[in-house]
Amino acid sequence: LTSHVTPPRYWLVMPAAGRGKRLGGATPKQFLTVAGRPLIAWALQPFFDDPRCAGVMLAVAPDDTDWLSFRASLPRPVLETSGGAERADSVRLALQALLARGAQAADWVLVHDAARPCVSNAEIKALVDAVVAHAEADLRAGGLLAVPLADTLKRGRSHSEATVPREGLWRALTPQMFRLGALLHALQQAESEGRKPTDEAQAMEWQGSEPLLVGGESTNIKVTTFADLRLVEGILQARSKGESP
């Protein structure tokens, strides 16, 4: 493991210890096959293709047989560590493992969901370029891919109680990019306070940071339903044929 990453190089952290199985019976969703490959393989590929990616650290369930089988098919070596009960725990443990292997606190880290198989090379480039350009000397600097909300929002349970103005509202995506030490500190602080951030940006916000919002693509969706699986399959098949999206 290289001891230091000179910007704009970065480490990729991918939390993949989840056991959400509602989509595929006994198979965690990140290992479900879509367009001929597991979701996680699609999610990893753009980072394998990016020369700025210095290395990959996955947080996995140590007894996950799906991971053990998949690991043998990877086109390049990756680092791995045991994940935690929650996403934030897995990311925190992965960051600690990177430091233990020689990464530096000032290094950049991108965190990406294993169940977001449609992230594009262009999105990754846009995020890295924008965050590095705005970083200056602020060790809390960082940012995330996001898409402005286009739908009308309603507040209510079974009935609409109010329409929520969508101006200034964004849908957060991944990857999310921060300096390793700053993100680790934010996650450790959240854990000590019993707080569970839903993403890395929220943990940084609790530290007073204002992460940069970098426009992402609406196709960069997270698979949570069977409808999502069908949608991402269409996206990936179109891309493999050189078509949009």
Which residue stretches match the model-derived regions?
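SAM-dependent methyltransferases
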Residues: 1-11, 199-201, 218-220, 228-245
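N-terminal glycine-rich phosphate-binding loop and ensuing alpha1 helix
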Residues: 7-65
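Residue-level signal for inorganic ion chemistry
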Residues: 14, 40, 94, 112-113, ...
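Short active-site oxyanion
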Residues: 52-56, 140-142, 219-220
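Short phosphate-binding loop-to-helix
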Residues: 72-107
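Acidic metal-phosphate-binding loop of nucleotide-sugar-dependent transferases
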Residues: 87, 114-118
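Conserved core of the sugar-phosphate nucleotidyltransferase
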Residues: 105, 119-215, 245
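Short acidic donor-binding/metal-coordinating loop in glycosyltransferase active sites
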Residues: 112-115, 174
